[in-house]
């Protein structure tokens, strides 16, 4: 397939980057040595598995929240937003990477390359901001329960989510001015090129990874302190009253945060090292480490739905109902009608001082 204009001068068949003056982490090997033979099959396997689990798992998350009244609350709207952030990469960037692997180079033109890299960034930054918002939500819910319903009213949460995605788009706009969205032949992907601007790379790592990690860590550390105090009854006069479901909710989101940090830390550490000293550090980054860091980052998009199913009974139960409905629609329609009638007889619990007013918050 023919490529247009300047993009055709950037990459040759086989993925070789030949743009002059483009060195380091974002470029191809100066000696044009072949890629390690494991890269294409490993990346293909990871992307195929990740895409399949990503689509099925995150659609299950979204449908579970929409179908189940116990899951339909302010906190879980952020989970739907996070699921959408994970879902977009499965529908556009990942299939395009598989096409690049098949052709041994980018064959879809510059427009698709820029769009694919933008959607990838949308997913990553959107995930970071949503995970941060979830941590703040859990922090307010447990540590400032008196003010929780004032902060997260029914119409406030959608506004918070819209603000998250607006900030995500704004955060990505500088990439078009810096020229950092390009094809990287080592990973067959159009992505963020770390050596396009070392100052911008450092800013991205600090603002979109280290700072959110610090905020989330603070929120969860404060929650852990209160949880331990409540369990040890260190403060008998405290009005904190945690139900097991509250603890499971917090634990689930804490695990999601830890997994995200583990999956994205290697790539961000590489980016920070390259930004500090691009001339010396970029050529010294082992290609196997660089590719593996991307494989780990790509794999993260399919893990959240699995965590919800493993750690949360309400999600696990709803997953089973949805899958059973797909397998045997008639049987599940009858069960759903009975279940909806039973739920309709239950009025929502009034707000209770403390943290027990959302027993099944996740």
From Swiss-Prot:
<dbReference type="GO" id="GO:0007186">
    <property type="term" value="P:G protein-coupled receptor signaling pathway"/>
</dbReference>
<dbReference type="GO" id="GO:0050796">
    <property type="term" value="P:regulation of insulin secretion"/>
</dbReference>
<feature type="transmembrane region" description="Helical; Name=1">
    <location>
        <begin position="43"/>
        <end position="63"/>
    </location>
</feature>
<keyword id="KW-0325">Glycoprotein</keyword>
<feature type="binding site">
    <location>
        <position position="175"/>
    </location>
    <ligand>
        <name>melatonin</name>
    </ligand>
</feature>
<dbReference type="GO" id="GO:0046010">
    <property type="term" value="P:positive regulation of circadian sleep/wake cycle, non-REM sleep"/>
</dbReference>
<keyword id="KW-0675">Receptor</keyword>
<feature type="transmembrane region" description="Helical; Name=3">
    <location>
        <begin position="116"/>
        <end position="136"/>
    </location>
</feature>
<feature type="binding site">
    <location>
        <position position="194"/>
    </location>
    <ligand>
        <name>melatonin</name>
    </ligand>
</feature>
<dbReference type="GO" id="GO:0046676">
    <property type="term" value="P:negative regulation of insulin secretion"/>
</dbReference>
<feature type="transmembrane region" description="Helical; Name=5">
    <location>
        <begin position="201"/>
        <end position="221"/>
    </location>
</feature>
<feature type="topological domain" description="Cytoplasmic">
    <location>
        <begin position="309"/>
        <end position="362"/>
    </location>
</feature>
<feature type="glycosylation site" description="N-linked (GlcNAc...) asparagine">
    <location>
        <position position="4"/>
    </location>
</feature>
<keyword id="KW-0297">G-protein coupled receptor</keyword>
<comment type="function">
    <text>High affinity receptor for melatonin. Likely to mediate the reproductive and circadian actions of melatonin. The activity of this receptor is mediated by pertussis toxin sensitive G proteins that inhibit adenylate cyclase activity.</text>
</comment>
<feature type="topological domain" description="Cytoplasmic">
    <location>
        <begin position="64"/>
        <end position="76"/>
    </location>
</feature>
<feature type="topological domain" description="Cytoplasmic">
    <location>
        <begin position="222"/>
        <end position="253"/>
    </location>
</feature>
<feature type="transmembrane region" description="Helical; Name=7">
    <location>
        <begin position="288"/>
        <end position="308"/>
    </location>
</feature>
<feature type="topological domain" description="Extracellular">
    <location>
        <begin position="177"/>
        <end position="200"/>
    </location>
</feature>
<dbReference type="GO" id="GO:0051970">
    <property type="term" value="P:negative regulation of transmission of nerve impulse"/>
</dbReference>
<dbReference type="GO" id="GO:0010754">
    <property type="term" value="P:negative regulation of cGMP-mediated signaling"/>
</dbReference>
<dbReference type="GO" id="GO:0043524">
    <property type="term" value="P:negative regulation of neuron apoptotic process"/>
</dbReference>
<dbReference type="GO" id="GO:0051481">
    <property type="term" value="P:negative regulation of cytosolic calcium ion concentration"/>
</dbReference>
<dbReference type="GO" id="GO:0007187">
    <property type="term" value="P:G protein-coupled receptor signaling pathway, coupled to cyclic nucleotide second messenger"/>
</dbReference>
<feature type="transmembrane region" description="Helical; Name=6">
    <location>
        <begin position="254"/>
        <end position="274"/>
    </location>
</feature>
<dbReference type="GO" id="GO:0005886">
    <property type="term" value="C:plasma membrane"/>
</dbReference>
<dbReference type="GO" id="GO:0098908">
    <property type="term" value="P:regulation of neuronal action potential"/>
</dbReference>
<feature type="topological domain" description="Extracellular">
    <location>
        <begin position="98"/>
        <end position="115"/>
    </location>
</feature>
<feature type="transmembrane region" description="Helical; Name=4">
    <location>
        <begin position="156"/>
        <end position="176"/>
    </location>
</feature>
<keyword id="KW-1015">Disulfide bond</keyword>
<keyword id="KW-0812">Transmembrane</keyword>
<comment type="subunit">
    <text>Interacts with GPR61, GPR62 and GPR135.</text>
</comment>
<protein>
    <recommendedName>
        <fullName>Melatonin receptor type 1B</fullName>
    </recommendedName>
</protein>
<keyword id="KW-0807">Transducer</keyword>
<feature type="topological domain" description="Extracellular">
    <location>
        <begin position="1"/>
        <end position="42"/>
    </location>
</feature>
<dbReference type="GO" id="GO:0045906">
    <property type="term" value="P:negative regulation of vasoconstriction"/>
</dbReference>
<dbReference type="GO" id="GO:0042593">
    <property type="term" value="P:glucose homeostasis"/>
</dbReference>
<keyword id="KW-1003">Cell membrane</keyword>
<keyword id="KW-1133">Transmembrane helix</keyword>
<dbReference type="InterPro" id="IPR000276">
    <property type="entry name" value="GPCR_Rhodpsn"/>
</dbReference>
<dbReference type="GO" id="GO:0051971">
    <property type="term" value="P:positive regulation of transmission of nerve impulse"/>
</dbReference>
<dbReference type="GO" id="GO:0043010">
    <property type="term" value="P:camera-type eye development"/>
</dbReference>
